[in-house]
Amino acid sequence: MLKMTEEHDKCVSDQPCSPSGTNSSMSQDESDSDAPSSPTGSDGQGSLLTSLGRKVDSEDDERFPACIRDAVSQVLKGYDWSLVPMPVRGNGSLKNKPHVKRPMNAFMVWAQAARRKLADQYPHLHNAELSKTLGKLWRLLSESEKRPFVDEAERLRIQHKKDHPDYKYQPRRRKNVKPGQSDSDSGAELAHHMYKAEPGMGGMGGITDAHHHAEHAGQPHGPPTPPTTPKTDLHHGAKQDLKHEGRRLIDSSRQNIDFSNVDISELSTDVISNMETFDVHEFDQYLPLNGHTSSSSSLPSDQPPAPVSSYASSYGHAGVNGPAWSRKGAMPSSSPSSGEVGQHRLHIKTEQLSPSHYSEHSHRSPPHSDYGSYSSPACVTSATSAASVPFSGSQCDYSDIQSSNYYNPYSSYSSSLYQYPYFHSSRRPYGSPILNSLSMAPAHSPTGSGWDQPVYTTLSRP
């Protein structure tokens, strides 16, 4: 069909070739374009078009010169017209019935009559402008002036009811929104909920209550998880793509820090760790188990335990008094370990940028002596700093929460060996590491003094 119309257009533009003017070829073109709209099947359409082609040939004998006829037949000969798809509009079965229009209302009666009259008088008027003017005029009409149009509309309605007793108005359905678009909308809405929930976290007491309640009820009060990820993710058979999607959403929500309460010096580690966290587990999936152990030996041996001491501080702290939590820079330098912790922070701040260091941290099992030396003093300092530094919700130590992502001594194990769920923080919303640490802390430290040594000896690498 398309090539036929192209040929005809060529004929139209080629005035010397076509002896009988444009109108004849145009009418032929119109008859061609109208033909496929008849609701026949593809076979019927093929036969219809072949008969049409014969008719075209017989008519073209007089209408077009021999050069054009030969060119057209040459083009049409090699084309299988049964392959041309029928234009399907809506339901094929409904197309067999003629479309019944709704009866006109009073305004339509007025507008149609007035438009005909005006179009005859002022043919240069644009249709849209005409419609606007007719609408304005209709609003200015009084009830008595509208009466004849209202009566006519009523008569048409009654007539329509007689003609089509079982008529039901079926407006055209809008096409469904593209799936990608709806997903992004729900994602944006979800992120909006997360951002909205974050500044209102208030004091730590509220967090502990809410998260304990969420732990028991299974319906979180914190930022909602994405609708696709499972609610309780302790079984790690979840699909990888869902996990990554959820993690990206959550990580993007973590970046919304209340900058009025955060020291600028702390910001670099927080932002960097938040930006790059989801890469770590992707490295863990694709790298061999001991991929970086050889190169990790060149790292300073005292570097990794800094996050562990911050773990110990937060967990011991939660055991001692929940409602207050210390900021990073607020630990008093009363014990030597807190100063060293600060130095280690600086080390990590410089090294965090390269992803290979992430994997080196995560594949490496630190020396056990460090745990013994760092866990209990850090708890003491955190307990003292708890009294001195009250906690405000947005000062939550993001990099401590994150540290299970970029520094995880047990990531070389299979995920079923992870005993405690706060090592899976990448699969949960950012509040849940706090949640799990608060609820699980008594398991580690019944007295609230620190982490038990056997946890590390049992889980360290053989």
Curated annotation (Swiss-Prot):
- Report any Pfam family annotated for this entry: HMG_box
Presence of keyword Transcription regulation: yes
Q: Where would I look for the motif 9aaTAD in this sequence? A: 415-423
Positions of the DNA-binding region: 100-168
GO biological processes: morphogenesis of an epithelium; negative regulation of transcription by RNA polymerase II; neural crest cell development
CDD domains attached here?
A: HMG-box_SoxE
SMART domains in UniProt? HMG (SM00398)
Annotated region Disordered: the residues are: 1-57, 155-243, 291-375, 442-462
* Cellular compartments per GO CC: nucleus
InterPro entries the record matches: HMG_box_dom, HMG_box_dom_sf, Sox_N, SOX_TF
- Keyword list, A-Z: DNA-binding, Nucleus, Transcription, Transcription regulation
Polar residues compositional bias: what residue ranges? 15-50, 446-462
Molecular function GO labels: DNA-binding transcription factor activity, RNA polymerase II-specific; RNA polymerase II cis-regulatory region sequence-specific DNA binding
Keyword DNA-binding on entry:
yes
Q: Where in the cell is it found?
A: Nucleus
Highest taxon of source: Eukaryota
- Where composition is biased (Basic and acidic residues), the residues are 1-12, 155-169, 209-218, 232-243
Purpose of the protein = May play a role in central nervous system, limb and facial development. May be involved in male sex determination. Binds the consensus motif 5'-[AT][AT]CAA[AT]G-3'.
The domain section of the record reads:
The 9aaTAD motif is a transactivation domain present in a large number of yeast and animal transcription factors.
Q: What is this protein called?
A: Transcription factor Sox-8
Q: Which organism is it from?
A: Tetraodon nigroviridis (Spotted green pufferfish)
Q: What is the lineage of its organism?
A: Eukaryota, Metazoa, Chordata, Craniata, Vertebrata
